[in-house]
């Protein structure tokens, strides 16, 4: 995840760093790996406010990330690098040799078209 830092041309710009989104692929997420995420807005099952000052925010879809990576010794190709609204890391859509797709957390320096493999 590249981070852009600014020169201190004004007082408010001193020490300012932002995430550079230029490396992301501009496309829609894979629908088979997404599902809806219900937001509570600080309310419990009775509808009463249990956490004050918490709103609903923007509507999000949850991307199912494969943390296990249990397809050992099978190469996969990185198809997209996407923004994930539910975490601070970028995610990568990979396609295995048997045409199965999954999301993984994208490490620094990962590019589209790169081959990845998980082994024990």
Where are these regions (language model features)?
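Short, acidic/hydrophobic/Gly-rich beta-strand patch recurrent on exposed beta strands
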Residues: 91-96
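Short alpha-helix capping/helix-loop boundary micro-motifs
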Residues: 101-105
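Basic, glycine/proline-rich low-complexity segments that contact nucleic acids
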Residues: 1-87, 108-120
């Amino acid at each position: 995840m590249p981070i852009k830092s600014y020169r201190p041309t004004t007082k408010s710009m001193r020490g300012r760093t932002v995430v550079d989104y230029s490396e992301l692929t501009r496309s829609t997420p894979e629908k088979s790996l997404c599902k809806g995420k219900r937001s509570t807005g600080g309310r419990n099952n009775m509808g009463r406010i249990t956490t004050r000052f918490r709103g609903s925010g923007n509507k999000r879809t949850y991307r199912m990330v494969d943390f296990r990576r249990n397809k050992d010794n099978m190469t996969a190709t990185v198809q997209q690098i996407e923004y994930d609204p539910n975490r601070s890391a970028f995610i990568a859509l990979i396609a295995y040799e048997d045409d199965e797709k999954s999301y993984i957390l994208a490490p620094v320096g990962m590019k589209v078209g790169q081959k990845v493999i998980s082994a024990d």
